[in-house]
């Protein structure tokens, strides 16, 4: 497989990871808001898949670096992909931590979540989606928006 094909595969895997993280963010906020323990367990269990995907993507980038010795532009792209990969995993951890608060909300039914919380989930996932797409498509204007 040549370098452009490997980078295309890497992009696909980053999109899959990003999509999984976005879903977990939405589900985590929803679980807390609705006090849904089952949904919170799903988010928590999905975190291990996110962690495994992060490790696989890191291995993939390292393999590309060893195999192809990429040019400056490709090297910068691959290093950025590593950073994004790490940040996606970290965001996934935050989603898990949010989901873990569901039990607290169930135990304290008198507590109400601020309306801004639901809006925060929408804003966060929208920003994440735009950032990943800008990176994958190498679209500077989208990244600046």
Model-identified regions with their sequence ranges:
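Cytosolic, long alpha-helical scaffolding segments
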Residues: 1-145
């Amino acid at each position: 497989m040549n370098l452009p094909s490997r980078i295309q595969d890497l992009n696909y895997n980053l999109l899959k990871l990003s999509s999984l993280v976005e879903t977990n963010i939405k589900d985590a906020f929803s679980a807390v808001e609705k006090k849904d323990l089952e949904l919170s367990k799903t988010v928590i269990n999905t975190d291990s898949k996110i962690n495994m995907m992060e490790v696989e993507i890191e291995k993939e980038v390292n393999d590309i670096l060893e195999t192809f010795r990429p040019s400056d532009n490709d090297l910068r792209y691959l290093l950025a992909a590593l950073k994004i990969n790490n940040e996606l995993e970290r965001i996934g951890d935050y989603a898990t931590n949010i989901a873990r608060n569901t039990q607290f909300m169930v135990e304290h039914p008198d507590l109400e979540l601020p309306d801004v919380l639901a809006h925060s989930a929408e804003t966060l996932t929208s920003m994440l989606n735009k950032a990943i797409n800008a990176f994958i498509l190498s679209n500077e204007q989208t990244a600046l928006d």
